[in-house]
Curated annotation (Swiss-Prot):
Residues 370-388, 839-849, 857-888 have a biased composition (Low complexity). It comes from Mus musculus. The modification Phosphoserine is found at residues 405, 851, 855, 918, 920, 934. Transmembrane segments: none annotated. The keyword Signal does not apply. One of its GO terms (molecular function) is DNA binding. This is Zinc finger CCCH domain-containing protein 3. Keywords: DNA-binding, Metal-binding, mRNA transport, Nucleus, Phosphoprotein, Repeat, Transport, Zinc, Zinc-finger. The keyword Zinc applies. Its main location: nucleus. One of its GO terms (cellular component) is mRNA cleavage and polyadenylation specificity factor complex. Residues 76-96, 327-338, 402-412, 460-470, 828-838, 914-928 have a biased composition (Polar residues). Interacts with SMAD1, SMAD3, SMAD4, CPSF2 and CPSF3.
Length: 950
């Protein structure tokens, strides 16, 4: 693609050269043809592509001075790049053929142009002129901002060649091979040669019958000039400085016109018989001067209205550095450009060296050859006439040190000033200069007040020169050595406090000056705004004007126009009571400052952790000079704003506290399953006693806490009980079975509400009300792993436990025999026995004190069924869930019961398989004496306890 682009650029360049050649050296006018001396513009199609044929019919009555208008419209370079792709074909041609016209009087011609790419990477362009000598009055192509020029009518013998140096050649990549342009026998030859280290040369050799020498047209990559060589018999004709815009990195016309318009007499390799070589600059038309002056004046007016900042421009791009010129500079540059082009001087203007010190430049610098790689860029599209700050001119020194009144700058490293260093003319006109002392080309040094920089011998104390500056009285405040803030008065914005890094716009009624200092400052202007920034970014603006958007950034050239940050120390230093001329503070200042008081806006506030309360009196009222106007007192307004802000903050804190205390519309899982919650009143979930799980011991008739101290519910509800596993198998014969007899599908999901302890749907719920993981019960492996909310019970242990001699059932003997027969008696290994003994010992030790934290952990490993024999058939497992609960103890319970060792706590508490059990201290001892009671409950049909095997 890069090679294609290079080829396209070269083809365009050569076509432009050919058109220029025809423009300047068209065939001689035909005899007797009145329209031969007039321009005959081409009628190009809209999308002109290579390989297409198009006609160039002449137009009647189109004089030569109308050239630039149609050139701009039908320019060859203005076409998009994608319109032609000539490099895809090694040999392609563009032919120009005229079409038959209805008018017999205008002359028409056929121009055949062939562009070929030879195999040795050479470009061959052939142009076949028409057979009639007077048919061609070729027209040039204007590129970019080519200036309009009047072509003279050639009356004598036409010149044979010319040398043209075109800018932009250095932007085109050099090709290793030469590009040759060949012609037919009778055609003029254009040979484009590019040798390394030498400029690109296009030789135009005319194969004419006479013995006139050959001339060449040179395309240089360094400068712009037009060298026209004539025989001695020809009159002196003028040349045109062609500013051709080639490629994206092209220079504008203003650069070429103002900065680089000169004529260079070049050496030509011609015999001595050629005669003298004459090269003169063509006088510029009024359109050129008008465009140049309009361009510069537009830039000047734009600069006056906008803020500008330094923006690093690309070093490769020779674009104009957008600097603004003063009216005087603009006038001088316009006059010099006009006079320099009209005068027939042959020596070129001297170039501006970027390394030359700007103090030595007597003339304004040329935009085309800017010594700085930075350019002005507008930072604000809108401009305001009323500004916070004004440009002040300071006379009395020769070098016109630019100084902007109150605002310090943070210049970037390597930036160069726009108007050059100190000895240039005033940049913004007669009465506007910036507040910076430019010491060198790389540093911008800020001036402090009116004092000169030490070491600058040439500077004298500046004096006000305009009528607006008589109000500007500056006075240093004798506070603290170097960093003492300086109060300055600007015409429309009240006092400005300037220290090393900040600028504060203070209303006059809030400036705390001593009586002696306040008398020296002009106080006649009412305050317009105020900005206060404290710890909580408190900002108060009066409706008369806004400090941030419209007025403040309109006059600041290079820094951001945001709210000026003020630290609390600066606020306290600025707003403290007045300091006397001797620099001693009032004796009352440390007293109120050390007691947690702060003076904000002249009002004393008492500061606490989250409260700001206003006090009744102001400190040191005698030493302060309050400047009151007809408006509302800004100090009172500020105090009200701060007080309301503190109130809003307090209310926000209260709202946040209330939101934290609000109960979520969700029941507490721990409270529902265990009857208690370790968080107590701090738990954000709902603790509803009606939703607590049913006491399984009460269901079996073995709960001793019938006085109401049992944490579980003694109200049996079907919504709280799991589904009877025997009912699902169809073998439950107990008419008074407390468990839910609801049939659900095997593929149904586990009810998440039931896992939390309570399902509001109850018997209508279509999901499984179980706590045992069905995947783990069937396969022994759960795909969810530790994140499963259901209990993973080991089947081997249940089978070993069901091998106890008395095997009870929930209803009668028949189901018990089935349940016992369905289990396989397996002898546990020694490792399992040791693990069981250790886990049972730990469980007993944790449950003995009946402390609340271990009780949910032990109880979580219990099951909800009243029959131990139904545990093997996965009736309702123990309610240990690993769901994300509001407490960490549930996760610990899951980790303890999910594994084989953790679930061995069932060995110590095998008396029931229930949701919960009361953490009574005797829970451990109850399992022992429950074994002899098994025969009685066996006859009564109630479920029996299983004696643990130790």
């Amino acid at each position: 693609m890069e090679e294609k682009e290079q080829l396209r650029r070269q083809i365009r360049l050569l076509q432009g050269l050919i058109d220029d050649y025809k423009t300047l050296h068209g065939n001689g006018p035909a005899l007797g043809n009145s329209s031969a001396t007039r321009w005959q513009p081409p009628m190009f199609p809209g999308g002109r592509t290579f390989g297409a044929r198009y006609s160039r019919p002449s137009r009647r009555g189109f004089s030569s001075h109308h050239g630039p208008s149609w050139r701009k419209k039908y320019s060859l370079v203005n076409q998009p790049v994608e319109s032609s792709d000539p490099a895809s074909d090694p040999a392609f041609q563009t032919s120009l053929r005229s079409e038959d016209s209805q008018h017999p009087e205008p002359q028409q011609y056929v121009l055949e142009r062939q562009v070929q790419l030879s195999p040795d990477q050479n470009m061959v362009i052939k142009i076949k002129p028409p057979s009639k000598s007077g048919a061609i009055n070729a027209s040039g192509v204007q590129r970019g901002s080519l200036e309009g020029c009047d072509d003279p009518s050639w009356s004598g013998q036409r010149p044979q060649g010319s040398e043209v140096e075109v800018p932009g050649g250095q932007l085109q990549p050099a090709r290793p091979g030469r590009t040759k342009v060949g012609y037919s026998v009778d055609d003029p030859l254009l040979v484009c040669q590019k040798e390394p280290g030498k400029p690109r040369v296009v030789k135009s050799v005319g194969r004419v019958s006479d013995s006139s020498p050959e001339h060449r047209r040179t395309v240089s990559e360094n400068e712009v000039a037009l060298r026209v060589h004539f025989p001695s018999v020809l009159p002196h004709h003028t040349a045109v400085a062609l500013g051709r815009k080639v490629g994206p990195h092209s220079t504008s016309y203003s650069e070429q016109f103002i900065g680089d318009q000169r004529a260079n007499t070049g050496h030509s390799d011609q015999p001595a018989s050629l005669g003298p070589v004459v090269a003169s600059v063509r006088p510029a038309t009024a359109r050129q001067v008008r465009e140049a002056s309009l361009l510069v004046s537009c830039r000047t007016s734009k600069f006056r209205k906008n803020n500008y900042k330094w923006v690093a421009a690309s070093e490769k791009s020779p674009r104009v550095a957008r600097r603004a010129l003063s009216p005087r500079t603009t006038l001088e540059s316009g006059n010099k450009a006009t006079l320099g082009t009209v005068g027939k001087t042959e020596k070129p203007q001297p170039k501006v060296d970027p390394e030359v010190r700007p103090e030595k430049l007597a003339t304004p610098s040329k935009p085309g050859l800017s010594p700085s790689k930075y350019k002005w860029k507008a930072s604000s599209p809108s401009a305001s006439s009323s500004s916070s700050f004004r440009w002040q001119s300071e006379a009395g020194s020769k070098d016109h040190t630019s100084q902007l009144s109150p605002v310090p700058s943070r210049p970037t490293s390597g930036d160069r000033p726009a108007g050059g260093p100190s000895s240039l003319k005033p940049l913004f006109g007669e009465s506007q200069l910036s507040a910076y002392k430019v010491k060198s080309r790389t540093k911008i040094i800020r001036r402090r007040g009116n004092t000169s920089i030490p070491g600058d011998k040439k500077n004298s104390p500046t004096t006000a020169t305009t009528s607006k500056n008589h109000l500007t009285q500056r006075r240093r405040q004798a506070l603290r050595g170097k960093n003492s803030p300086v109060l300055r008065k600007t015409p429309h914005k009240g006092l400005m406090q300037v220290n090393r890094h900040r600028l504060c716009c203070l209303p006059s009624s809030r400036t705390h000056l001593s009586t002696k200092e306040a008398s020296s400052v002009h106080m006649g202007i009412p305050p317009s705004n105020k900005v206060i920034k404290t710890r909580y970014r408190i900002v108060k603006k009066t409706p008369s004007s806004s400090f941030g958007a419209p007025s403040f950034p309109s006059s600041l050239p290079s820094w951001r126009a945001r709210r000026i940050p003020l630290s609390r120390s600066l606020v306290l230093n600025r707003l403290r009571p007045a300091i006397t001329g001797g620099g001693k503070a009032p004796p009352g200042t440390p007293r109120w400052r050390n007691k947690g008081y702060r003076c904000i806006g002249g009002v004393l506030y008492k500061v606490s952790a989250n409260k700001l309360s206003k006090t009744s009196s102001r400190p040191s009222d005698g030493n302060r000079t309050l400047l009151r106007t007809g408006r509302l007192d800004p100090a009172t307004t500020c105090s009200r704003s701060l007080a309301s802000r503190a109130i809003q903050r307090s209310l926000a804190i209260i709202r946040q506290a209330k939101q934290k205390k609000e109960k979520k519309r969700e029941y507490c899982m721990y409270y529902n399953r265990f009857g208690r919650c370790n968080r107590g009143e701090c738990c954000p979930y709902i603790h509803d006693p009606e939703k607590v799980a049913v006491c399984t011991r009460f269901v079996r008739g073995t709960c001793k806490k019938t006085d109401g101290s049992c944490p579980f519910s003694h109200h049996v509800s079907k919504e709280k009980m799991p589904v009877c596993s025997y009912f699902l198998k169809g073998i439950c014969s107990n008419s008074n079975c407390p468990y839910s007899h609801v049939y659900v599908s095997r593929k149904a999901e586990v009810c998440s509400d039931f896992l939390k302890g309570y399902c509001p749907l109850g018997a209508k719920c279509k999901k499984k009300h179980t706590l045992l993981c069905p995947d783990f019960a069937r396969r022994g492996i759960c795909p969810r792993g530790s994140q499963c909310q259901l209990l993973h019970r080991n089947q081997k242990r249940h089978g070993r436990r069901t091998a106890a001699p008395p095997i009870p059932g929930p209803s009668d003997g028949a189901p018990r025999s089935k349940a016992s027969a369905g289990h396989v008696l397996r002898k546990p290994t020694t490792t399992q026995r040791s693990v069981r003994q250790m886990s049972s010992g730990l469980a007993s030790g944790a449950e003995a004190p009946a402390s609340p934290p271990p009780s949910p952990r032990v109880l979580a490993s219990t099951s909800t069924l009243s029959s131990k024999a139904t545990a093997a058939s996965s009736p309702s497992p123990s309610p240990s869930t690993s769901s994300p609960a509001p407490s960490l103890e549930q996760e610990e319970a899951v980790s303890g019961t999910g594994s084989g060792t953790g679930s061995s706590g069932l060995c110590k508490l095998p008396s029931f398989i229930s949701l919960h059990s009361s953490p009574s201290p005797g829970g451990q001892t109850e399992t022992g004496p429950q074994a002899p009671r098994s025969p009685r409950t066996k006859d009564s049909g109630k479920p029996l306890h299983i004696k643990p095997r130790l």
